[in-house]
């Protein structure tokens, strides 16, 4: 590509040696304005019909948006009809302003006011393109000609609003602001401000769009800080952002521009919009949320937001989309899973109000997601992830050494199959390998213990097992049922076995609850685990020993 690179030139920087935005932080939410129904809609392959628009409109109200751009009513009958529906039947709350877009053309402005008749404090958003490129190639006008278009529109709009009895709000956008020389953008905006004469009770929105993202986010922030310093009547202005995402940094540009002094953001849910999209307001809002700032829009049911978005836009959200994608709260990596597992346990024990879990910048429950899919198992997964799934989904608290042992078994399966293993498959494999053992040679049946009169402090264990289906009676000595039973089994099999580690826990609550026992057994050649589940904890332990013995026999027979 080196030869093609000569076609392009670097974007000019802004000379602000005393810029202040790099030392600031976002401490409050901006005014949010959704443009899903206008900018988002015009970018769709199949634009929304009335039902899809209405569902999106009501979702935006539910989420708490106070300013919603509902369309371009002078451009199509569909948008005009929807604007009238919003005004007459949309049940718009008193604190929500409908916003409509209009070009700086008299006949379109007239039609726009017809669409808004009866609306409560609507926003008339008028614009014209001011960039050097469009002045030269599209309009063939100089700066004065472009400025006059904006000034004439501002006069007509304010006059019509006065004749209609007032109650209107105004917004002006120098479209393609990022392609406009700053002094030109300032001259045109100040001319509009002079006409509109904003007041503390009716501030003018000056919207400075990154219609095409052309530079790094810091440059946009510099442009916004420069404009905020130089705009006339700044105290009676609301400086608004409208970033696009052509370079993939729309969110970063918006965040830095808020630091630079902007008050308001126009964007869409999940960033739908022309070309690579508008700024994603859900991601922006949740970025603030994870920094302890209330975003003032409700993202607590992100699955519902996703559902309406996908229905209304007929677009699917990617699996890795921040905060909402199917896989964003999921870890496959073994080291990540282990850290998450330990972090979740530490959080439960500490009961600390601050969320601190490795690899999870947000508590999934805060956006209506669950912990169930945080850890999923494939060939990259480790013992911590497998242990987490068994504990969270099935209440099994595997000892660490058993986690290591079972992970090797799961690793073999995922290496062969080359795909993710669902939670139930992992659980079924554990039960089959360590508890039920359908191919196991031995089965525990029953046992009795009584004092050993010849050896003080010891007990004799008399047990029944089956060996390939035949009842066998075995007997051993030890300081308790577990010790005595493994002694009996060792003599019966002719294999010296001993218990290295033992743990147990209940699986449910109540006096008749089942319990699971984990027994690590050593034998000449290694160590292996077994597990048993029974309402009698001693029986569960003896079943676990039989399970371990079956696995020892498999090893010696070359089956494992």
Curated annotation (Swiss-Prot):
PROSITE patterns named in the record: AIPM_HOMOCIT_SYNTH_1, AIPM_HOMOCIT_SYNTH_2, PYR_CT
**Could you tell me which Pfam families the record lists for this protein?**
HMGL-like, IPMS_D2, LeuA_dimer
What the entry lists under SMART domains is as follows:
LeuA_dimer
Q: What is its main location?
A: cytoplasm
Q: Biological process (GO) annotations?
A: L-leucine biosynthetic process
Cofactor(s) in the UniProt record:
Mg(2+)
Residue numbers binding Mg(2+) = 39, 242, 244, 278
Catalytic reaction equation(s): 3-methyl-2-oxobutanoate + acetyl-CoA + H2O = (2S)-2-isopropylmalate + CoA + H(+)
Q: Which GO terms of the molecular function aspect are on file?
A: 2-isopropylmalate synthase activity; acetyl-CoA C-acetyltransferase activity; magnesium ion binding
Region ranges (Regulatory domain): 437-560
UniProt keywords, alphabetically? Amino-acid biosynthesis, Branched-chain amino acid biosynthesis, Cytoplasm, Leucine biosynthesis, Magnesium, Metal-binding, Transferase
Enzyme Commission code: 2.3.3.13
Locations listed in the record: Cytoplasm
Which cellular component, as a GO term, is one annotated location?
A: cytoplasm
Pyruvate carboxyltransferase domain: which residues?
A: 30-303
Assembly and oligomerization = Homodimer.
* Job description of the protein: Catalyzes the condensation of the acetyl group of acetyl-CoA with 3-methyl-2-oxobutanoate (2-ketoisovalerate) to form 3-carboxy-3-hydroxy-4-methylpentanoate (2-isopropylmalate).
Family assignment from sequence similarity:
Belongs to the alpha-IPM synthase/homocitrate synthase family. LeuA type 2 subfamily.
Q: What is this protein called?
A: 2-isopropylmalate synthase
């Amino acid at each position: 590509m080196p030869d093609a690179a000569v076609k392009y030139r670097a974007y000019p920087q802004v000379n602000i040696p005393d810029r202040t935005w790099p030392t600031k932080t976002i401490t409050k939410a901006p005014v949010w304005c959704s443009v899903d129904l206008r900018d988002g809609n015009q970018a769709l392959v199949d634009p929304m019909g009335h039902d899809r628009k209405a569902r999106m409109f009501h979702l935006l109200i539910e989420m708490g948006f106070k300013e919603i751009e509902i369309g371009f009513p002078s451009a199509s009958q569909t948008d005009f009809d929807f604007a009238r529906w919003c005004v007459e039947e949309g049940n718009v709350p008193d604190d929500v302003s409908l916003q409509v877009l209009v070009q700086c053309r008299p006949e379109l402005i007239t039609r726009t006011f017809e669409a808004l008749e009866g609306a409560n404090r609507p926003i008339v958003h008028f614009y014209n393109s001011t960039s050097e490129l469009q002045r030269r190639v599209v309009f063939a006008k100089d700066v004065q000609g472009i400025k006059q278009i904006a000034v004439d529109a501002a006069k007509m709009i304010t006059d019509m609003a006065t004749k209609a009895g007032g109650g209107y709000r105004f917004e002006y956008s120098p479209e393609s602001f990022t392609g406009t020389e700053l002094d030109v953008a300032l001259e045109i905006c100040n001319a509009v401000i002079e006409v509109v004469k904003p007041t503390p009770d009716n501030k003018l929105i000056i919207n400075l769009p990154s219609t095409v993202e052309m530079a790094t986010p810091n440059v946009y922030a510099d442009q916004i800080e420069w404009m905020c310093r130089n705009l006339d009547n700044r105290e009676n202005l609301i400086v608004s952002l409208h970033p696009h995402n052509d370079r993939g940094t729309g969110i970063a540009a918006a965040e830095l521009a808020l630091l630079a002094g902007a008050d308001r953001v126009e964007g869409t849910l999940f960033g739908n919009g022309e070309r690579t999209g508008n700024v994603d307001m859900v991601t922006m809002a949740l970025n603030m949320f994870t920094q302890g700032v209330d975003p003032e829009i409700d993202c607590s049911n992100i699955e519902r937001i996703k559902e309406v978005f996908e229905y209304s836009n007929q677009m699917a959200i990617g699996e890795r989309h921040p905060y909402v994608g199917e896989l964003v709260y999921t870890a496959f990596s073994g080291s990540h899973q282990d850290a998450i597992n330990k972090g979740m346990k530490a959080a439960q024990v500490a009961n600390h109000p601050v969320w601190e879990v490795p690899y999870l910048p947000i508590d999934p429950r805060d956006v209506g997601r669950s912990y169930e899919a945080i850890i999923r198992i494939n060939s990259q997964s480790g013992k911590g992830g497998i242990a987490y799934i068994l504990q969270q989904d099935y209440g099994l608290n595997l000892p660490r050494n058993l986690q290591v042992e079972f992970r090797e078994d799961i690793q073999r399966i995922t290496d062969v199959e080359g795909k993710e293993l669902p939670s139930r498959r992992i659980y079924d494999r554990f039960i089959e390998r360590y508890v039920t053992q359908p191919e196991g040679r031995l089965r525990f049946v029953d046992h009795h213990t009584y004092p050993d009169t010849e050896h003080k402090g010891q007990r004799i264990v008399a047990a029944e097992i089956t060996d390939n289906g035949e009842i066998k009676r075995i007997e051993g000595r030890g300081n308790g049922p577990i010790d005595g039973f493994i002694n009996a089994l060792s003599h019966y099999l002719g294999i010296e076995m001993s218990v290295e580690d033992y743990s147990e826990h209940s699986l449910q609550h109540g006096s008749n609850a089942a319990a699971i026992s984990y027994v690590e057994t050593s034998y000449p050649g290694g160590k292996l685990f077994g597990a048993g589940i029974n309402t009698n904890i001693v029986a569960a332990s003896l079943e676990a020993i039989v399970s371990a013995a079956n696995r020892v026999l498999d090893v010696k027979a070359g089956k494992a």
